[in-house]
């Protein structure tokens, strides 16, 4: 049927993005080009969606000192000074473990972008003017099993990864609140001193 065309083409497999900040940027671009209502997207929503996508694409590390979440953060360039993580070694191990290459399997950016768009439409329908990471997680959870591109045998593992992302979001949200409260306390102190001086 298309022999002449097929003779002149060569398939090149290209892996998904493995840095979740870059993945989040893909979703932002998709939303800018999508026909969805403009609304406030709460902090961490895109990053946590990206983190979920990356977790489904990377191979679980062999050693006990680096977990899957730490590996995803290391790939993103987030290594604490005290951590002894060799990103190059992690990538080599991932390549050896993967069927073709690390990043060739997992949830697609299209699936995640579509679910974010659905979550926005759902929030609009419910009269909300914002999109929270929790509603994005709920959409992932509800639709993982029913999506044709996600093999049934991966669903339970992906749901486990989603729980890791929920916990990471919770920690980041708590840290944001701590930071905001600490800032407000200092600001209150300065304003109080300024008031007393004048």
Language-model segments: which ranges?
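Generic alpha-helix detector with strongest preference for long hydrophobic helices that associate
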Residues: 8, 93-101, 154, 158
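Terminal-proximal interaction/regulatory segments of ATP-powered molecular machines
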Residues: 118-198
């Amino acid at each position: 049927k298309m022999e002449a065309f097929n003779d002149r083409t060569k398939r090149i497999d290209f892996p998904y993005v493995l840095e979740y900040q870059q993945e989040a940027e893909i979703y932002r671009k998709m939303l800018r080009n999508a026909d969805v209502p403009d609304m406030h997207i709460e902090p961490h929503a895109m990053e946590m969606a990206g983190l979920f996508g990356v977790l489904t694409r990377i191979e679980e590390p062999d050693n006990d000192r680096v977990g899957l979440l730490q590996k995803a953060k290391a790939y993103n360039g987030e290594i604490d000074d005290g951590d002894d993580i060799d990103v190059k070694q992690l990538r080599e191990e991932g390549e050896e473990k993967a069927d073709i290459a690390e990043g060739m399997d997992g949830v697609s950016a299209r699936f995640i972008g579509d679910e974010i768009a659905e979550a926005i439409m759902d929030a609009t329908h419910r009269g909300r003017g914002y999109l929270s990471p929790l509603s994005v997680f709920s959409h992932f959870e509800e639709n993982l099993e029913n999506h044709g591109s996600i093999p049934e045998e991966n669903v339970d593992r992906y749901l486990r990864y989603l729980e890791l992302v929920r916990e990471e979001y919770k920690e980041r949200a708590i840290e944001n609140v701590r930071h905001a409260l600490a800032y407000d306390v200092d600001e209150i102190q300065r304003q109080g001193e300024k008031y007393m001086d004048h």
